[in-house]
Amino acid sequence: MPDKMPRDSSHEDPPQLGPDSSSLLEKDQLDRRRFLKTTAAGLLVSSLAGPVRVMGAGGSDSSFQSRWPADVERYWLGPAYWTNPLQDWRLADGRVEMIGNGGDRNVQHLTRQIRAEGGPLDLRVETGFLTSANARAGVEVGVQGALAEYRNNAIHGTGLKAGHTAGDRLFVGDTEARLDRAPGADGAVLHLTTTPTEDGHTLTLSVLDAASEKELGQVQKTGVSAETLAGNLALFGGVDEGEVSDREWGTPKLWFRNWEGQGAALEAHDERAFGPILFSQHTLSRGTMKMTAQFPPMGAADGSTVRLQVRRDEAWTSVDEAEVHERARTATFRVTDWDEGRDVPYRLVYDYRMAGGSRTDHYEGTVRRNPVDQDEVVVGGFSCAMDMAFPHPRVAAGARAHDPDVLAFTGDQYYESTGGYGVQRNQENVERATLDVLRKWVLHGWAFGDLMRDRPTICLLDDHDVYHGNIWGEGGKHVDRWELHNNGGYFMPPEWVNAVQRMQTSHLPDPYDPTPVKNDITVYYTDMVYGRISFALLEDRKWKTGPDGFLPPNPGRPDHIEDSDFDPSTIDLPKAKLLGERQLAFLEDWTADWRGADMKAVVSQTSFAQVPTHHGGNFKYLVADLDSNGWPQTPRDEALRRIRKGFAVHLGGDQHLPMLLRYGIDGWNDAPYNFCVPGIAVGYVRAFWPEDGGDNPQTDVPEHPGRYTDGLGNKVTVRAVANPKEDFAAENPLRTLTNKSSGYGLLRFNKATREITAECWPLLSDPAQGAEAQYAGWPQTFSMLDNDPREPVGHLPRLSVTGATNPMVQVVDEEQGEIVYTLRIQGQEFRPPVYADGAYTVRVGDDGWQASREGVRPSEGTGDALEVSV
């Protein structure tokens, strides 16, 4: 038989792949046997691994029967199965049909596994071919990936195949035989048994005619080790006809029915069932709780609504009901007047069809109390998850150990290559493309759902989330040909983009201004107040100008500048946009609004600077990368001036290079801090290896600290950076990822001291080892006030406030009519700094402006006081 087609895909960030990129995204499988022999057991299943749910054997009855319903049609087969890829399988007429071409399409059984000890095994399944092409079908045993974890097995695993072809062959691995004749119109029964012997296991495959039950052929393979058999079990199908067109997609090629298994080799893991409620995300802000439940593609016979219930007085009470969105497969709840003062257990309730009638699925979690009285609020920062180490057990376990109050996923929750089988980047069949992106997104929830169910989650989209290497949104513009995508705009259809945004962001607080952009593409930029931390959640890409056709011609990629003589002022052009006027107006309002907040943070996709100097697996030197928020420069400065008004730190990702930066606008260190968190699993590597050392280096921080001017002319101070190893490849994929500077970050907001601590944790770190386990240069602590570090020209008279503790203070330049800054002070006294001579209005209040003084001027003395009562 031909070798199995690989499921895994490129480890590199694929920004320039075209629409039909399946072949480019496939790669050779990891040698999992070699990996298992060389990996210490404690590396993967350690004290950190609790939330990964690597369970022991379940109940004593490990036999199974598929029992697919005859009266249900849908793409999702049921909670015990995972299909690769989702869009190439469907349930119809009581059988599973493969509706796409290609090699190694498969159905993974999630709740049954073959023991490492081996033993007798008996598997049966009916199957039939609906094409005369070179097709094959059968069962696969011992499916195992590099991490020896059932979800990793399901996505990246290889196993031993036993099956038959549409011609006259049957096979177990590389052992083949011929059928006496082809099965009849009713198909065949495949019967696989494993029998332990002194020399291993003997596998016997018999093919029977389904109608007559007459044996048509048999083949045996001897000497198979228990290690080879251990792992997942699956059905597989393959049709070698090339990529199926959108018009042909949906026509069945082959089918399976009545899959059964029994024997001592099987172990039950019913706790691994997945769906139909796959995972949820929620936020809690200003008394309103929003939650989105994610579903697989259900059918017309299944329920169309979902109930949200909370536990009160030992009973479940329904508080909201929501429709399942037809395209996004989500249900979003919005509950006002939420009880923020206590942990609230919740469950989602959904009715669906399986064999025997209706079933009810329950998904439970907790909406935690709002930690308003907690001195420290911890935010976990995550981005950029290639799938080679799915389900990212060390990141999930590390996050669980830190127990952050808020999760922040800043973009690239998946890549075009995630889950293998290429990418459906096309505009013709929106449903097929939506199923493709849904399977990639669901992997994110499968990895981190146990964390998200119990804590507020910020989730923002970046370029790869909408199938772009770089996305220049230009206010919702549409691009009708892929080769024009660098001109600006979205290639994927607006209804697809909106579905993806609904999947990832519909649980966020209501948008600041919900008016859609061009082509009716929705927006989600908003604010969230939780634990008395005020967050601004931005969309870096939606309004950004595309470089191709806008900037002067540039050799090579329009977003990569390689000319060392390049003058960055030549691309700082009028009309170029970054955040856009709407988000700038939002930031102006947000920085002035401190109701219910003690500290502020901006969360967005990427940094407002171009720091990495070397890119890609060969570490190619680049002067500038226009994908960063360092370009366009003037809008970049405008954004930072607004963020600075609220003393807000900036949290983001995208760069695949952990960095702690201090922005500069007119000079160095006159703008906020930025923490660019590591990628969860880095593919495309970047490094900061400047040719010259920075000015004024920080001697206590390793690797090129100091003041720099980036390739776009922006001023930036590098406080810490965790560069990858030049020779990053390792046999252990987790070690490779750590060598590429993968991991996660934390921001700790200390409301008592108004200090912020940035922590940067390598992928293979152990939080129990303390701060020394972090990347060199971290942790670092700085004051909230350091986010507006300008040198004042003077100070207004000292404020002495009565009637409020820790009041809000706002300073307004009367000549310019502009807010200089707003903050919530500590205590009742504050001497406001100002940065120009003149008259100022000072406003003071608790959760509203209750007092103001106009015409206040800088005072040279320290004894002058401005008494204010609120």
Region spans (language model):
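Long, structured stretches of catalytic cores involved in phosphate-ester chemistry, encompassing
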Residues: 255, 260-264, 286, 295, ...
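N-terminal twin-arginine translocation
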Residues: 23-34, 43-59
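Carbohydrate-binding surfaces in secreted/extracellular proteins
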Residues: 125, 183-221
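Short carbohydrate-recognition loop motifs
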Residues: 89-105
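Glycine-aromatic-enriched beta-strand/loop faces of beta-sandwich-type recognition domains
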Residues: 140-196, 712-736
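Secretory/extracellular carbohydrate-interaction modules
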Residues: 100-174
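N-terminal secretory signal peptides
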Residues: 1-31
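Flexible glycan-contacting loops in extracellular carbohydrate-active proteins
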Residues: 216-251
